[in-house]
Amino acid sequence: MELKVTTLEGKEAGSVQLSDAIFGLEPRQDIVQRCVIWQLAKRQAGTHKAKGRAEIWRTGKKMYKQKGTGGARHGSQRVPQFRGGGRAFGPVVRSHAIDLPKKVRALALRHALSAKAKGGGLIVIDKAELEAAKTKALVGAFSGLGLTNALIIDGAEVNNGFATAARNIPNIDVLPVQGINVYDIVRRRKLVLTKAALDALEARFK
């Protein structure tokens, strides 16, 4: 698959040949979905907690005698039916992470990249660099490229000026190539790769 390369100013800068093994797969939503669920489950903090009846600080003495009061038969005051009692089957601190094999994760990334390429949501630029970290200038460049909701992937290191200018623009994410992931690709309308990022991805999946 051949794709045009443009500059940030919207000028043509040649073309690039995309690998069919990375960008030419028939997208499978089930594999992509598995990876997204894995990512979102892994990022959950799992710090929610409610005290059970064994953790409530309250006397364990029987409330009143068993018979003769006309009231129901109660023992401990820590039980869930009383105000201030322990929660029955409440949430506990735990990890929400699930297992997903590395090969499936790598396959999901290739399917997400292929889906963007097939749907016309992939743009290749020569480099993502700015001389001055000015958000206004970058907004103008993005407007010329038609980018309002995009994930931009640079090489191993992101240009400081570019990252600083982009961080205040809504719906624009900038990541180094080692940070590329399925969830961020799926949640943004456009995927923008620099030539350095493209070379790194092809070396990674070689």
From Swiss-Prot:
It holds the Pfam family Ribosomal_L4. It comes from the Bacteria. One of its GO terms (cellular component) is ribonucleoprotein complex. InterPro entries: Ribosomal_uL4, Ribosomal_uL4-like, Ribosomal_uL4_dom_sf. GO terms for biological process: translation. Keywords: Ribonucleoprotein, Ribosomal protein, RNA-binding, rRNA-binding. SUPFAM superfamilies: Ribosomal protein L4. One of its GO terms (molecular function) is structural constituent of ribosome. Part of the 50S ribosomal subunit. Belongs to the universal ribosomal protein uL4 family. One of the primary rRNA binding proteins, this protein initially binds near the 5'-end of the 23S rRNA. It is important during the early stages of 50S assembly. It makes multiple contacts with different domains of the 23S rRNA in the assembled 50S subunit and ribosome. Forms part of the polypeptide exit tunnel. This is Large ribosomal subunit protein uL4. It comes from Rhodopseudomonas palustris (strain BisB5).
